[in-house]
From Swiss-Prot:
Organism, as annotated: Cryptococcus neoformans var. grubii serotype A (strain H99 / ATCC 208821 / CBS 10515 / FGSC 9487) (Filobasidiella neoformans var. grubii)
Phenotype reported upon loss of the gene: Abnormal sexual reproduction; decreases MFalpha1 expression and abolishes hyphal elongation. Decreases virulence in a mouse intranasal inhalation model for pulmonary infection. Normal vegetative cell population growth at high temperature.
Annotated GO CC locations: cytosol
Protein name: Post-transcriptional regulator MKT1
Family: Belongs to the XPG/RAD2 endonuclease family.
PANTHER family for this protein: FLAP ENDONUCLEASE FAMILY MEMBER, POST-TRANSCRIPTIONAL REGULATOR MKT1
Principal location: cytoplasm
Name of the gene encoding the protein in the UniProt record: MKT1
GO biological process: regulation of translation
Record has Transmembrane as a keyword: no
Localization terms from the record: Cytoplasm, Cytosol
Length: 768
C-alpha cells in the first residue's frame, strides 16, 4: 500500500523521475514482494479478474514472474525478494457491517447476472470495478512463488514483521546486501532516500527521491514520517478531519503548522470527536512501528532497526528502545522461530494466529450455509480440527505461557456488533493434546526409509510411500524405533516423519502405526493410481471431505433450494445428483492449464464447492508446517541446517485448485446428453452409432471451447481415471464399515455410498 494520495501528487508535481533499466546493471535490487505482486494482480496487462468466478490462483502469474526474472537476468540485475512477515498487534476487527465485503458481493452478484444473460465480457468488466480486478490473497501465492525462486536460484527472505523495514536494513547494512529498493512510496517513511516505484523490467524504471519531496512539501524527514501516517498508509488510517475532502496539501500544511504529527492529533478537531483518543493511540503505535521496526539480522537475531543501523550518524543505545514494543509488534518468540519464518518453513500467517491471538476468517468467493458450519466446526473449533491442532503444535514448543493464551476467531458471518472476544480455538483440549503427545512416536531412521523406497520402487518421499510403508504388520513393526539420543538428520528423514506424524494426527494412522479405516481406503486408492496422474493429494482431500460430510450430490441448502448457475443441465433429480457428485469430485483434481486466463464456461455450483476444497487444503498445508517445525524445535530433528526450503517444498498441498476440471467434466457430460437427443447414454446404447456420434461431438466441443487447457481430451480421460480411484476408496470404506457400522466407525454414510454407486453406474456408458 502507498501513502494515500501521494502517488497522484508526485505525478502532478512531476517528482517522478525515469531512468534506463541498464543503470541498474551489476547491482542487487531489493524487491518488496507485496508491492510487486499487487502490481501484477491489478495491472490491466496481467490481472485475472475471472479468478472471482473460477477460484484457485491466477493461471498466468508464475509465467509472468518468470518473464520478469529473465528480463532482470538479461540486464545483470540480481533480485532479492522480501515478503511481509507477522502481523502487528491490533485490536479485533470492528463488528459493524463490512462495507468492503458488501461491495465485493454486490459486484460479484452483478457479474454473475451478466454472465447468466450471455454477456461474458461485460461480466469481466464488472469484476474489474472491485479492487482493480484482484480477488487473490497474496499469502495464497507464497508457496508457488517460493518454489519458482528455489528452482531459479532467486534469493528471498520473509521479514519478521514489516517487509519494508527488512529492505531498509539490507540497504543500509555496511556490507551493502542490496543497492536499491523497488517498493511503494510508503518506503520513504523509513531511512531510505530513494525508491523505485515502477518498472517494465525491459527498458525503464521510475523512482522518487525523498529530498525532492521534502523540499516540495517543505517538511523535515521526521515530519514526513508523521505526514505519511496522518495521510493514511498500511500502518494507519487517514486522520478523521472535519473537512469532507482529503488532500495531500492539507495534511502537509497541518504537520508544518503544528510542527509534528502528535500535535496535529492533540490540537485538531476530529470527526467524530470520541474517536480522537483512539486515533492518537494508533498514531503513536504506527510511528513507533516505523522508528523501531524489528528486523532479522544476518546473525539471526530479531532486533529493532536503529540498534543495527544508526540513522544519520545519531548516537543510539539499546536503552533508547521503548520497553513496550510487544504492544506494537507481538510478544517475543524465539529467534529460531523467526528464522524458520524467514526461510519459509512455516508461514507468518500461522505463527501470527498465536502471536496476535486472533484468526480472522475472510469470506470465500461464494459461500453456503454448509460452508459456515464446515469452516467453524471442521476446520477451526473442533478439538481435532486442522487449525486447532496447528496452534497446539506451535504452542507446545514455546514457553508454557503461550499455552495460556486465548486465540479468538472472528468469522465474516459473525452478527454485527457481536461480543469482541468472539469464538475461540480450544487448543488446550485434552483430545488435542493427546494428538500432540503421539507425534514423538515417529522417529523412523534413514536406513528404514531406504529399504522402503527400494521395496516400493520409488524415488520420492510422499503420502503414497508413507501410507504404503504401513501396509502389513511386518512393515508397521519397522516403524517403531526407540528415540534414544538420536535425532533425525537428513532432509528425507524429516519429511517422511513429518508425513507420518501428520497422518496420525489426522486419523489415517492409528496409535499402533497401523492403517485406520480411512487410512485403508487411502491406501487402496493409491494402489490403483498411476504415478504420472498425480492423484495423491486430491484423493486425500476427497476422503477428508467425505468424512466432514460435505461431499455429496445434493443441492446446497437442501432439496428445495434453488439450483446454482453452472450445475447439471439435463436429466431428472437422481441424474442431476449424479452429475453434481461427479463434477464435484473431479473438480478437486488440478487441471493442467496454459499460462493464460481461463477460457471456458463458469460454474457457481462448483465455485461453492471449491470453497470447501480450498479451506481444507490451506488448513492442511498449515498443519504440515506446524508438524515440521514442531519436529525440529522439539529436538527430534537436527536444528542447525540449511535445507529449510527443501523441506518446505517437499511437503504436500503447495497450491490451490480451481473449478476447471469439474467444469471440463460437466461440459463433456452435458454435451454428450445434448447430442444424444437430450438424454444420457445408457448401457443398452453402448456401441450404437448414435451414442458414438454423441461422444465424438462432445469431444469436439471440448477441444473447441477449452483453449486454456493443455490437451483437454487427455485431461478428461485423466479425470475419469481419478473417479475410478475414488470409487476404489468408496468401496473399501463400504466393505470395512460393514452394513451396520457404529457411529465411531463411520467415515461416510450409507446414503452417500449409494449416491456414488448410482453415479458410477450412470457414468460408465457416458465415458469417451
Amino acid at each position: 500500500m502507498t501513502i494515500r494520495g501521494l502517488d497522484n501528487y508526485l505525478k502532478e508535481r512531476k517528482l517522478i523521475q525515469s531512468c534506463p533499466i541498464s543503470t541498474l546493471a551489476n547491482t542487487r535490487l531489493g524487491i518488496d514482494a507485496t508491492h510487486y505482486l499487487n502490481h501484477l494482480l491489478t495491472d490491466p496487462n496481467s490481472r485475472e479478474p475471472l479468478v472471482a468466478a473460477t477460484g484457485g490462483l491466477p493461471l498466468a502469474i508464475i509465467s509472468k514472474i518468470e518473464s520478469d526474472l529473465r528480463a532482470l537476468e538479461r540486464h545483470a540485475i540480481k533480485p532479492v525478494f522480501v515478503f511481509a512477515g507477522l502481523p502487528l498487534a491490533s485490536r479485533p476487527p470492528p463488528k459493524g457491517p463490512d462495507i468492503k465485503a458488501e461491495r465485493e458481493n454486490q459486484i460479484k452478484n452483478e457479474a454473475w447476472a451478466l454472465y447468466d444473460e450471455g454477456q461474458a465480457y461485460s461480466a469481466v468488466d464488472k469484476l474489474v470495478q472491485f479492487n482493480n480486478g484482484n480477488f487473490v490473497d497474496q499469502r495464497d501465492l507464497l508457496r508457488s512463488i517460493m518454489r519458482l525462486f528455489r528452482h531459479r536460484y532467486v534469493e528471498f527472505v520473509v521479514a519478521p514483521y514489516l517487509g519494508i523495514a527488512q529492505l531498509a536494513y539490507l540497504l543500509q547494512h555496511p556490507k551493502g546486501y542490496i543497492h536499491a529498493i523497488y517498493s511503494s512510496s510508503e518506503c520513504l517513511m523509513w531511512p531510505v532516500e530513494r525508491v523505485i516505484t515502477s518498472s517494465d523490467w525491459n527498458n525503464n524504471f521510475q523512482f522518487v527521491e525523498k529530498v525532492r519531496i521534502l523540499n516540495d512539501l517543505n517538511l523535515t524527514s521526521e515530519q514526513f514520517l508523521d505526514f505519511g501516517i496522518l495521510a493514511g498508509s498500511s500502518l494507519s488510517r487517514t486522520i478523521p478531519l472535519p473537512q469532507s475532502e482529503f488532500s495531500i496539501k492539507n495534511i502537509a500544511d497541518l504537520v508544518r503548522h503544528h510542527k509534528s504529527g502528535i500535535s496535529v492529533c492533540q490540537n485538531v478537531r476530529q470527526e467524530p470527536p470520541y474517536k480522537a483518543q483512539f486515533y492518537t493511540e494508533s498514531f503513536w503505535k504506527a510511528r513507533l512501528a516505523v522508528k523501531f521496526s524489528l528486523v532479522l539480522t544476518t546473525e539471526g537475531a530479531c532486533v529493532p532497526l536503529p540498534t543495527v543501523i544508526t540513522p544519520q550518524q545519531q548516537a543510539f543505545t539499546v536503552q533508547d528502545v521503548p520497553g513496550d514494543l510487544e504492544e506494537i509488534f507481538s510478544p517475543r518468540i524465539p529467534d529460531e522461530l523467526y528464522f524458520h519464518i524467514c526461510r519459509g518453513l512455516v508461514s507468518a500467517q500461522v505463527v501470527g494466529w498465536l502471536t496476535s491471538g486472533m484468526i480472522i476468517e475472510q469470506q470465500p468467493l461464494l459461500e453456503t450455509g454448509e460452508y459456515r458450519r464446515f469452516i467453524k466446526d471442521v476446520i477451526t473449533e473442533g478439538p481435532t480440527s486442522p487449525r486447532c491442532t496447528t496452534i497446539a503444535l506451535l504452542a507446545d514448543i514455546l514457553h508454557p505461557d503461550w499455552s495460556k493464551r486465548r486465540i479468538n476467531v472472528h468469522y465474516y458471518f459473525d452478527p454485527p456488533y457481536a461480543p469482541v472476544r468472539g469464538a475461540f480455538v480450544p487448543f488446550t483440549d485434552a483430545l488435542t493434546q493427546s494428538l500432540i503427545g503421539r507425534c514423538s512416536d515417529w522417529m523412523v531412521p534413514m536406513f528404514n526409509l531406504e529399504m522402503e523406497l527400494r521395496r516400493q520402487n520409488s524415488s520420492t518421499i510422499d503420502l503414497k510411500l508413507c501410507i504404503g510403508a504401513l501396509a502389513s504388520e511386518e512393515l508397521v513393526h519397522r516403524t517403531f524405533k526407540p528415540k534414544g539420543d538420536r535425532v533425525l538428520d537428513k532432509k528425507d528423514e524429516v519429511v517422511a516423519n513429518s508425513l507420518w506424524r501428520f497422518l496420525e494426527v489426522r486419523g489415517f494412522v492409528q496409535q499402533n502405526h497401523a492403517h485406520s479405516l480411512i487410512g485403508k481406503a487411502l491406501y487402496a486408492a493409491y494402489t490403483v493410481s498411476r504415478v504420472n496422474d498425480r492423484f495423491q493429494e486430491p484423493i486425500y482431500l476427497i476422503l477428508e471431505l467425505l468424512r466432514a460430510g460435505v461431499l455429496h450430490g445434493g443441492k446446497w441448502g437442501g432439496p428445495e433450494a434453488a439450483p446454482l448457475l453452472g450445475g447439471p443441465s439435463f436429466g431428472d433429480e437422481d441424474e442431476q445428483n449424479s452429475v453434481r457428485l461427479i463434477m464435484r469430485c473431479i473438480s478437486v483434481l488440478p487441471l493442467v492449464s496454459r499460462n493464460q486466463q481461463w477460457v471456458g464456461p463458469l460454474s457457481q455450483e462448483l465455485l461453492a464447492f471449491n470453497a470447501f476444497v480450498r479451506g481444507l487444503s490451506k488448513s492442511l498445508r498449515q498443519l504440515f508446517e506446524a508438524v515440521s517445525v514442531h519436529l525440529l524445535l522439539s529436538g527430534d530433528g537436527r536444528r542447525n541446517r540449511d535445507d529449510y526450503s527443501d523441506i518446505m517444498l517437499s511437503l504436500p498441498f503447495q497450491t490451490d485448485v480451481n473449478t476447471g476440471f469439474g467444469i471440463l467434466a460437466k461440459s463433456y457430460l452435458d454435451a454428450t446428453s445434448y447430442h444424444n437427443q437430450l438424454e444420457p447414454i445408457t448401457e443398452e446404447m453402448i456401441g450404437t452409432e448414435g451414442a458414438e456420434t454423441a461422444k465424438r461431438q462432445a469431444i469436439l466441443f471440448i477441444e473447441e471451447n477449452f483453449s486454456s487447457v493443455k490437451a483437454p481430451v487427455q485431461e478428461l480421460e485423466r479425470g475419469f481415471r481419478f473417479w475410478d480411484a475414488v470409487m476404489v476408496a468408496i468401496r473399501c470404506l463400504a466393505e470395512e464399515q460393514g452394513p451396520n457400522p457404529k457411529l465411531a466407525q463411520t467415515v461416510v454414510g450409507r446414503d452417500v455410498i449409494e449416491q456414488f454407486e448410482r453415479a458410477d453406474k450412470w457414468l460408465k456408458p457416458m465415458r469417451p
